[in-house]
UniProtKB/Swiss-Prot annotation:
SUPFAM superfamilies found in the cross-reference section: C-terminal effector domain of the bipartite response regulators, P-loop containing nucleoside triphosphate hydrolases, TPR-like
An individual GO BP term: positive regulation of DNA-templated transcription
Native organism taxonomy: Bacteria, Pseudomonadati, Pseudomonadota, Gammaproteobacteria, Enterobacterales
Family matches, as Pfam families: GerE, TPR_MalT
UniProt DNA-binding residue ranges: 853-872
Gene that encodes it: malT
Official protein name in the record: HTH-type transcriptional regulator MalT
PANTHER family named among the record's database cross-references: DNA-BINDING TRANSCRIPTIONAL ACTIVATOR DEVR_DOSR
Length: 901
């Protein structure tokens, strides 16, 4: 719940001097990205901007306090201010910030700017007291904000110091409007206006000018002179003499002498107690000060000119001028030290009564009242946890004695979930075990269930499937239906364990149940997680169209609940990319991988490993080895600088091994094979993938026998567990093993089964990636004309993609290759004495790639008759009569040059 006063522009007070010269300068504010008002306290920054803002409708105002250093709180108020300015134009951003479904402040702002793209009118956002921000993450985000905000938007920042917002760059580009303390200082004319409306007796212009010069135009000093003159019934000149030599550092003494000591005891007590409130209204004042009719008291303080500011048009909310408020709080600690805890307790109770638990916690912490803090947390902590107010929760729990936590197991559970959310898995079990051992109260069965559900989540995160399964089942037996969150967690873990153990049908049913429960209780991140798991299971079963439809449902949920910036969104984009890659929709697959990397752009670079592996995979499918190598360099750097789950390493290793296969890098494959772990089982698609990597490396090294043993066992497991996508992949690798070891009949049998299975999976690129060896076999099958219609169509599509992307043979016949070939000692004498032209070498490469005459003509953009002439000439020079002879001749030349064909 947001405090309304923090979003209200200050009310324009009576008897204030209208700063015409500065307002004239600000009239062109919409031409700048940033308007920066900087000066020490008391120079009239807020008053000036409130005068300028009067009458502007498309303007949001955000008044900061120390608590806004929490990123989530800062984001909530900033988006609320924008919504105020735009009439709720940015609904998606508001939903994201309310549910804390954004990856970072920068990514939230990026979403905000997308929504503001169709906002046509000038838009202003005022942030007051920016000097209170000391969180570097917020500074970074606001620099991003300034770089990317719409052209029709102006940010207005008020600060006592120069904020860390990349101001120099804006200044150079003439995108910064600055007003500093020298410009804010009152002129002689403004000082005269000020005294004329504040003093009962007029003051001469010369005297006014001299007073202005004495205090260097400092508005607070002029206000204090006028206040002192009124309170003491003395002249302004007399007050000024007493003020001579006073500056901000000595102001405290002056305020004691000239303000506090000149009000009655009741008012003094009111000022000191109320200063502990960062903002105040009638109810808060009555509870904290004990005075009746708090609103009337506030208005009286305002009338006396005691530095009280209205914060909204209704006049309900007030706050002290920052300079005066800081002074009063210091005096309160001196003069009311004994009463201080009780005052803070009263403030906390009043904030709670108005529904602001975060503000109440601030005062409970200040009071040092562990019992009150405990009670607030017991009633409101889980709501705060669900709204990601994690920093304040952590601070609050740390302030509670361990004995208090032991008496309240739900708070221990909360602390454990905080650790889990920060990936401090080992600490979770340590905390829960210690609590159970030392707890004086008897935990009921439901609480045991809550503990076990969390332990199950930690166990599955840690890869301990058996313990995760045991704990999740125990939790589900212990938990009543009312403990829906823990039941969702335990059910999800149970489904994930079944998935890992290859029990796909059961896992699918459990994940569907998890989705229903999560949707029923609006636990959207678990709903999304369960749909993603369903898609993975369907993919593993070979039902890729059904997996696609699950993903569509997940994308719809992401849009509806504004989950675009959750890291889990990257997981969804990644599995969509994998599916698109399988179907040879490479541009779309690469776009999804890039989107996934964008979602994680504000996290550690290591988090992008899986999407980066997909980028490599797309390049490999295109036959673009240079680009693949470029991505691989980054991928291998990330692998060497992080600790990853075995599944992540397996996916990264997959593209590395394929790259080594394509480039014939046996040394790299051998080194990797010596070091890579060999899993004990292969009962899920994660482990199947790692064993397939091993088999591929063994085939590259010519170790056919151990590779065959691996693949036969993989296929046995895949058939029994119905891992049909893995079976499809395994058959293709087995085909390559048979082909390279000269077992052509067995190779054809494996390929035919793989083609049939692809009718279900839709696989294209898993064939394409095998390159020329696959192309040769498909050409033979197509020429035999014995394939069923679907398989024939797929074979033609695969061959077309291989010819399009895998031009090793075509690329090999470039000028550099031909020059090396002609200088090779074993080159046939016929080629040396009667060399082909460069165009004829190109035609030979395309013939070898399986192109027809018409396709070659289209590729080289020449007439078909010209191609026939080139073919006739190269046949004559090579001494061959038929197309197949030319293909065999090209193959022999490539082998002679060391290319694995």
């Amino acid at each position: 719940m947001l405090i309304p006063s923090k979003l209200s522009r200050p009310v324009r007070l009576e008897h204030t001097v209208v700063r015409e010269r500065l307002l004239a300068k600000l009239s062109g504010a919409n031409n700048y990205r940033l308007v920066l008002i900087t000066s020490p306290a008391g120079y009239g920054k807020t008053t000036l901007i409130s005068q300028w803002a009067a009458g502007k409708n498309d303007l949001g105002w955000f008044s900061l306090d120390e608590g806004d250093n929490q990123q989530e709180r800062f984001a909530s108020y900033l988006i609320a201010a924008i919504q105020q300015a735009t009439g709720n134009h940015c609904a998606a951003s508001e939903a994201m910030v309310q549910k804390r479904q954004y990856a970072s402040l920068s990514s939230l702002f990026a979403q905000l700017f997308i929504e503001l793209a169709d906002w046509q009118r000038p838009l202003y956002l005022v942030i007051d007291d920016y000097h209170l921000i000391n969180n570097p993450v917020i500074h970074d985000a606001m620099r991003f904000f300034l770089r990317h905000q719409p052209e029709n938007m102006t940010l207005v920042v008020l600060s006592r110091n120069l904020p860390q917002l990349g101001i120099a760059n804006l200044r150079v580009r003439d995108q910064l409007l600055e007003i500093g303390s020298q410009q804010l200082a009152f002129t002689h004319q403004e000082a005269k206006q000020f005294f004329d409306c504040r003093l009962t007796s007029p003051i001469e212009a010369d005297d006014s000018s001299r007073l202005c010069d004495d205090v260097a135009g400092w508005a607070t000093a002029l206000q204090l002179i006028a206040l002192s003159a009124r309170q003491n019934n003395s002249s302004a000149q007399h007050s000024a003499r007493r003020f001579a030599g006073i500056n901000a550092s000595h102001l405290s003494d002056y305020l004691v002498d000239e303000v506090l000591d000149n009000v009655d005891a009741r008012t003094r007590n009111f000022l000191l107690k109320s200063s502990l409130l960062r903002s105040m209204n009638d109810a808060l004042i009555v509870r904290v000060t004990g005075e009746e009719n708090g609103q009337m008291q506030l208005e009286e303080i305002e009338r006396q000119g005691l530095f009280l500011q209205r914060m909204d048009d209704s006049g309900e909310w007030f706050r002290y001028h920052p300079l005066f408020g800081s002074f009063l709080r210091q005096r309160c600690q001196w003069e009311l030290a004994v009463e201080l805890p009780e005052i803070h307790r009263a403030a906390a109770e009043s904030w709670m009564a108005q529904g602001f638990p975060s503000e109440a916690i601030h005062h409970a912490l200040a009071a040092g009242d562990a019992k009150m803090l405990r009670d607030i947390l017991l009633n409101h902590a889980w709501g705060m946890f669900n709204h990601s107010e994690l920093g304040l929760l952590e601070q609050s729990l740390a302030a509670l004695p361990w004995s208090n936590l032991l008496e309240n197991p739900r708070l221990i559970l909360l602390q454990a979930w905080l650790m889990q959310s920060q990936h401090r898995y080992s600490e979770v079990n340590t905390l829960l075990a210690r609590a159970e051992q030392e707890m004086s109260v008897e935990m009921d069965t439901a609480m045991h269930g809550d503990f076990n559900a969390l332990r199950a989540q930690v166990a599955i995160n840690d890869g301990d499937q058996d313990e995760a399964e045991r704990l999740s089942m125990v939790a589900l037996e212990e938990l009543p239906l009312a403990n829906y969150y823990s039941r969702i967690v335990a059910t999800s873990v149970h489904g994930e364990v079944l998935h890992c153990k290859g029990k796909l049908t059961k896992s699918l049913a459990v994940m569907q149940q998890t989705e229903q429960m999560a949707r029923r209780h609006d636990v959207w991140h678990y709903a999304l997680w369960s749909i993603i798991q369903q898609s993975e299971i369907l993919f593993a079963q070979g039902f890729l169209q059904a997996a696609w439809e699950s993903q569509e449902k997940a994308f719809q949920l992401v849009r509806e609940q504004h989950l675009e910036q959750l890291p889990m969104h990257e997981f969804l984009l990644r599995i969509r990319s994998q599916l698109l890659w399988a179907w040879a929709r490479l541009d779309e697959a690469e776009a999804c991988a890039r989107q996934g990397m964008d979602v994680l752009s504000t996290y550690q670079p290591q988090q992008q490993l899986q999407c980066l592996a997909l980028m490599v995979q797309c390049s490999l499918a295109r036959g673009d080895l240079d680009n693949a190598r470029s991505h691989l360099n980054r991928l291998e750097n990330l692998l060497g600088n992080g600790h990853y789950h075995s599944d992540w390493v397996s996916n990264a290793d997959k593209v590395r091994v394929i790259y080594w296969q394509m480039t014939g890098d046996k040394t790299a494959a051998a080194n990797w094979l010596r070091q890579t772990p060999k899993p004990e089982f292969a009962n899920n698609h994660f482990l199947q993938s790692q064993w397939r990597n091993i088999a591929r490396a063994q085939i590259l090294l010519g170790d056919f026998e151990p590779a065959e043993m691996v693949l036969e066992e993989l296929n046995e497991n895949a058939r029994s567990l119905r891992l049909m996508s893995d079976l499809n992949r395994n058959l293709l690798l087995l085909n390559q093993l048979y082909w390279q070891s000269g077992r052509k009949s067995e190779a054809q049998k494996a390929l035919l089964e793989a083609l049939t299975l692809a009718n279900r999976t839709g696989f294209i690129n898993h064939f394409v990636i095998e390159g020329e060896a696959m192309a040769q076999q498909l050409r033979q099958l197509i020429q035999l004309n014995t394939l069923p219609e679907l398989e024939q169509h797929r074979a033609q599509r695969i061959l077309r993609d291989i010819n399009q992307h895998h031009r090793h043979k075509f690329a090999h016949f470039d000028e550099g290759f031909v020059e090396r070939l002609l200088n090779h000692p074993e080159v046939p004498e016929l080629i040396r004495t009667s060399p082909l032209t460069q165009r004829e070498w190109q035609v030979l490469g395309l013939i070898y790639s399986g192109y027809s005459n018409e396709q070659i003509a289209g590729e080289l953009d020449v007439a078909a008759t010209t191609i026939k002439t080139h073919i006739r000439n190269l046949y004559q020079k090579l001494g061959v009569a038929h197309r197949q002879d030319a293909v065999q001749h090209a193959q022999q030349l490539l082998k002679m040059m060391g290319y694995g064909v």
